[in-house]
A protein has these predicted regions:
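Extracytoplasmic ligand-binding site segments that recognize negatively charged/polar headgroups
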Residues: 2, 7-154
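Periplasmic-binding protein-like
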Residues: 124-133, 171-195
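Ligand-binding "clamshell"
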Residues: 17-25, 50-52, 167-179, 241-245
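A bilobed periplasmic-binding-protein/Venus flytrap-type ligand-binding module shared by bacterial periplasmic
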Residues: 66-71, 110-111, 187-199, 210, ...
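A ligand-binding cleft/hinge motif common to bilobed small-molecule-binding domains
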Residues: 12-16, 151, 157-174
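Mature extracytoplasmic/periplasmic domains
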Residues: 194-255
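Conserved C-terminal helix/tail region of periplasmic/extracytoplasmic solute-binding proteins
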Residues: 251-281
Length: 281
């Protein structure tokens, strides 16, 4: 099968692909609609694509806590403001955690005041123990299911991506989203082109098409994940959505925000081994 372009998802995967010489440099002369991508998002991508040679921002967002105000009121528990609130024993059986090694460890590392990209074994051991200690409180480790469970009122709170939070609020008005005060992961998904792509110029044409303001708007309205396209945001007619603090938070108002970076093979192995200990404990 011939692959012309890919959206590898996680920003740190792009860094890994760059380091392994798997990506083609993009000819930005073929992508005039790149001008609609906000400068701040191009700066964000430099954390994994330092010279902006290999990627074009597609979607972005944060990881935070989605909570059901009605259920929390019934439990007599205040709205969460920090990651440490996910260790509140009053919430036993009401917490949904992401079934993802990087996201789960990010929560614990941030709770403890450490970097989401830490490879310090002492810090990771502390985070691992925190996750083990949290397990009796967890209803389930989930990925996509967090959306449906929260919409259905099956849990009081869960760790979720901001784009999913926007969708859930459309379905259940009792749901609110917060970026914890300790900081979080700010992620950005980007388009890249494999080095051996047989139709690189067509791939660039497609990326340029996806950077058109009207196209980016339709994409955002359909999938509810935030667009880095300034022209698309200007075209949003729903004022509540256009000014949504979930979709378009003012990142300057938060501290401790980080994109994930590639940890190297040793770092990946360390995280994966510790995650297995958490899940099997």
């Amino acid at each position: 099968m011939e692959i012309t372009f890919v959206n590898p998802g996680a920003d740190y995967m792009i860094q890994r692909m760059i380091e392994n010489d798997l990506l083609a440099e993009i000819n930005y002369d073929h992508i005039p609609n790149l001008k609609y991508i906000g400068d701040n998002y191009m700066k964000m991508t430099r954390q994994f694509d330092p010279e902006n040679k290999y990627s074009v921002p597609y979607l972005w967002g944060t990881v935070g806590i989605l909570y059901n105000t009605k259920l929390l009121d019934e439990l007599g528990v205040p709205a969460p403001t920090k990651w440490a609130d996910l260790w509140d024993e009053r919430l036993s059986g009401e917490i949904l955690m992401q079934d993802s090694v990087r996201d789960a460890f990010m929560v614990a590392l941030k709770k403890d005041g450490f970097s989401a990209n830490s490879t310090d074994e002492t810090e990771l051991q502390q985070a691992k123990q925190d996750l083990i200690d949290q397990k009796p409180l967890i209803q389930a480790y989930v990925i996509d299911q967090v959306r449906d469970k929260m919409i259905g009122g099956e849990a009081a709170l869960g760790v979720i991506y901001s784009g999913e939070a926007i969708f859930t609020q459309r379905e259940n008005p009792d749901l609110e989203y917060v970026i914890p005060k300790e900081g979080t992961n700010v992620w950005i998904d980007s388009w890249v082109i494999p080095k051996n792509a047989p139709n690189k110029e067509n791939a660039e044409k497609f990326i340029d098409f996806m950077c058109r303001g009207d196209v980016a708007l339709k994409n955002f309205e359909y999938i509810t994940y935030s667009t880095p396209n300034d022209a698309a945001r200007d075209l949003i007619e729903d004022e509540d959505l256009k000014n949504s603090k979930i979709a378009f938070p003012d990142l300057s108002q938060y501290s401790g925000l980080e994109t994930y970076t590639y940890l190297g093979e040793d770092g990946d192995s360390l995280y994966n081994d510790m995650w297995k200990e958490v899940k099997s404990n």
